[in-house]
């Protein structure tokens, strides 16, 4: 880390830091003085909310950060899922970004990958609403990723 990182948390808010879950009992500011893997509670996707292909990919990628002990297994599932998504999506912007996201995870930059996946949600919503991806394809992806939910 080139500089310190300061994060403000509200009372009762949780943060996932290097696999540990911390909850604060009052408004606090935390300053990270060195490299750390963290995820803010409002960026954590719950299993029941992983209802679309990209949200399912996000859920798997967040497991790499939240559960360091299972990172190898999560990364393996991420690889399988990203290959499936690249084969299912036809939108050039989504395909290019999926390849970049795969590279981010390969480089150990899962946090940045999560941001990139979230940025694709509006495009995915348009694709699914226009049924550019068939319901059968979406269901196939859901079944493949179901063990993670």
UniProtKB/Swiss-Prot annotation:
It comes from the Bacteria. GO terms for molecular function: mRNA 5'-UTR binding. This is Probable flagellum biosynthesis repressor protein FlbT. Pfam families: FlbT. One of its GO terms (biological process) is mRNA catabolic process. The lineage of its organism: Bacteria, Pseudomonadati, Pseudomonadota, Alphaproteobacteria, Hyphomicrobiales. Belongs to the FlbT family. HAMAP family: FlbT. It comes from Sinorhizobium medicae (strain WSM419) (Ensifer medicae). The gene is flbT. Keywords: Bacterial flagellum biogenesis, Repressor, RNA-binding. Signal peptide: none annotated. Has a post-transcriptional repressor function in flagellum biogenesis. Associates with the 5'-UTR of fljK mRNA and promotes its degradation.
């Amino acid at each position: 880390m080139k500089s310190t990182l300061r994060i403000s948390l509200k009372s009762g808010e949780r943060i996932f830091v290097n696999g540990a879950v911390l909850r604060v009992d009052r408004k606090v500011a935390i300053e990270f003085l060195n490299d750390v893997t963290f995820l803010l509670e409002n960026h954590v996707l719950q299993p029941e909310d992983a209802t679309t292909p990209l949200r399912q990919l996000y859920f798997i990628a967040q497991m790499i950060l939240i559960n360091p002990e299972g990172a190898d297994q999560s990364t393996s599932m991420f690889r399988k899922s990203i290959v499936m998504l690249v084969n299912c999506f036809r939108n050039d912007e989504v395909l290019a970004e999926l390849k970049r996201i795969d590279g981010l995870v390969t480089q150990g930059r899962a946090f940045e990958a999560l941001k990139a996946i979230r940025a694709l949600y509006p495009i995915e919503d348009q694709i699914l609403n226009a049924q550019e991806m068939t319901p059968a394809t979406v269901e196939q992806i859901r079944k493949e990723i179901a063990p993670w939910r």
